[in-house]
């Protein structure tokens, strides 16, 4: 499934992500845009450490989920393949776990590069949230 920006914003808001650990809704949506282009089936198997990234938030198999190809800390206690389906409830639950670590949203390189410290005040203006 490919979400629209506003559709994802509404979903994230309904799951309590606006202000979660101090990050505005716009930060979460911006991160998803640059990580996956809002695509729940996004997959990147080309990380230098042999790990892969899964789903709309590009959750990494070395730390957050279990894949069959290598060992994992599996901090979200889930199979990585679950992050590739249309239901993003489990992806959101795992993102909440990720952001509780000291790095916060800096765990996402695309967020650091494209969203961190930027003026996102108008980012969701058209969504009528």
From Swiss-Prot:
Segments forming domain C-type lysozyme: 1-129
Keyword Protease: no
Organism annotation: Canis lupus familiaris (Dog)
Entry keyword Metal-binding: yes
GO terms of biological process kind: defense response to bacterium; killing of cells of another organism
Binding site for Ca(2+): 82, 85, 87, 90-91
EC nos: 3.2.1.17
Task performed by this protein: Lysozymes have primarily a bacteriolytic function; those in tissues and body fluids are associated with the monocyte-macrophage system and enhance the activity of immunoagents.
Cofactor note: Binds 1 Ca(2+) ion per subunit.
Domain of life: Eukaryota
Protein name in the entry: Lysozyme C, milk isozyme
Similarity-based family: Belongs to the glycosyl hydrolase 22 family.
